[in-house]
């Protein structure tokens, strides 16, 4: 009887995990889209961007990055999400294999151009504007734009989630990077050593804001991703922290 109950519990947990993955895009099958590229052969033009990550090399994202069209960007909530992409249905320009990229920027619409002739990022199109180096791993440079298939995949990161504290007193702006698992953060809370947990508001990209006075307190952070999973990093910033510093917390597993 005990083994039977444990077996049923295991099946239930497996089904729940499968349901969560399906709801948030994992194992949901391949979706058709298009891809172009930008940023130059060294991807220098991809630095910065609407997600606020700044230097993508120093942040660990490198050149495996993409700017997302309006339909995918979700007003910045998709920043940090990972996608597997492969070129399809174009034997003249496609290369074999697939790439995995992180969403780091926004590809704005160009309503002056038709959706199929320059307005690739116009709603409701699903479009990836890739860094040039990663584009050339699935298609030839001369192609310019190619049909692709994509799917959401978990993000694999080295080390823990990183929290960079910017701003000033009463305006704490925390950039959250290097997030594994779902990758796209939908909620952040902060707790000082003399305060309770306080929900932060998303300022832009993956910059999260708190208007409370947190100076002189050890800081803990609670991060919730789009799949509903939460990870808590306790007291990762000492009471002596200062603006401009980066601290590493726990990671999604």
UniProtKB/Swiss-Prot annotation:
Ribonucleoprotein is among the record's keywords: no
PROSITE patterns xrefs: EXPANSIN_CBD, EXPANSIN_EG45
A Gene Ontology term for the protein's cellular component: extracellular region
Domain Expansin-like CBD: 170-249
Keyword vocabulary terms for this entry: Cell wall, Cell wall biogenesis/degradation, Membrane, Secreted, Signal
A UniProt-annotated Pfam family: Expansin_C
Topology with respect to the bilayer: Peripheral membrane protein
Secreted listed as a keyword: yes
Highest taxon, organism lineage: Eukaryota
Domain Expansin-like EG45 per the UniProt entry, residue ranges: 48-160
Family annotation (SMART domains): DPBB_1 (SM00837)
Range of residues in the leader sequence: 1-25
Compartment annotation: Secreted, Cell wall; Membrane
Gene3D superfamilies for this protein: Expansin, cellulose-binding-like domain, RlpA-like domain
BP-aspect Gene Ontology terms: plant-type cell wall loosening; syncytium formation
InterPro entries in the record: Expan_Lol_pI, Expansin, Expansin/allergen_DPBB_dom, Expansin_CBD, Expansin_CBD_sf, RlpA-like_DPBB, RlpA-like_sf
Family: Belongs to the expansin family. Expansin A subfamily.
Function: Causes loosening and extension of plant cell walls by disrupting non-covalent bonding between cellulose microfibrils and matrix glucans. No enzymatic activity has been found.
Name this polypeptide is given: Expansin-A15
Organism, as annotated: Arabidopsis thaliana (Mouse-ear cress)
């Amino acid at each position: 009887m005990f083994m039977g109950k444990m077996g049923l519990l295991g099946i239930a947990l497996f089904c729940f995990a499968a349901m969560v993955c399906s709801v948030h895009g994992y194992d949901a099958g391949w979706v058709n889209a298009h891809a172009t590229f930008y940023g130059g052969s060294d991807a220098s033009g991809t630095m910065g961007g609407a997600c606020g990550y700044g230097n993508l090399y120093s942040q660990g994202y490198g050149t495996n990055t993409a700017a997302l069209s309006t339909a995918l960007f979700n007003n910045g909530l998709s920043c940090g999400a990972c996608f597997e992409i492969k070129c399809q249905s174009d034997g003249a320009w496609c290369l074999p294999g697939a790439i995995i990229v992180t969403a780091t920027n926004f590809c704005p619409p160009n309503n002056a151009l038709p959706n199929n002739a320059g307005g690739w990022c116009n709603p409701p199109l699903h479009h990836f504007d890739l860094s040039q180096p990663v584009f050339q791993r699935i298609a030839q440079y001369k192609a310019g734009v190619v049909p692709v298939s994509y799917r959401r995949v978990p993000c694999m990161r080295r080390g823990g989630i990183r929290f960079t504290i910017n701003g000033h007193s009463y305006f704490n702006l925390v950039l959250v990077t290097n997030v594994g698992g779902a990758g796209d953060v939908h909620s952040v809370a902060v707790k000082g050593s003399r305060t309770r947990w306080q929900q932060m508001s998303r300022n832009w990209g993956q910059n999260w804001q708190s208007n409370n006075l947190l100076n002189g307190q050890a800081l803990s952070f609670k991060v919730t991703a789009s799949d509903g999973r939460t990870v808590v990093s306790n007291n990762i910033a000492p009471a002596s922290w200062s603006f401009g510093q980066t601290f590493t917390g726990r990671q999604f597993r």
